[in-house]
Amino acid sequence: MNIFVTDPDPVKSAEVLPDKHVVKMPLETCQMLAVVYSKWYYDWGNDLLPKKDGTPYNTEKGAFRGHPCTIWAAQSIANTAWLIQHGFGLLEEYTHRYGKIHSCQTAMNEAERVFEEKTGRTLLCHKEATPFAFAGPDVFKYDTSIDTLTAYKRYISSKPWAASNYLRDPSKKPNWL
């Protein structure tokens, strides 16, 4: 579970991620949002976000509720909006690279609907998000000479597979990789 934040703009942050992240991060985003919406944080309901088969994400045990990124997402409505926008960015990028709709599309649509219904705000409030949490190796986490965005870029760059994982659209590979 993580949010690989490489840019303050949630869509731009999604656009530069490797193929592997574009495939798996929408699911992690939906799982995180389900926990944030559940009794563990906002208490909007435990069965609001449907998986592709229509069943809700299981939030009863609150898996990952203590993860730094989940805590960050729940710290403010703006942070939650940022995560939803990032999720949509990931879904758009998935469709661009793979030519099909990700199985998390329905859950993300519902996440936006519930967010707007419960808060009375649109996702544009994501611009008010607080500084991002970093969940990664200590070598990046405790490097006080870099910010969180740079830490995530270096974390991604440290993966031996990352630089060659833009097979679907090599033009998306960022210059920092």
List each model region and its residues:
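Sequence termini and other peripheral, non-core segments
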Residues: 1-66, 70-177
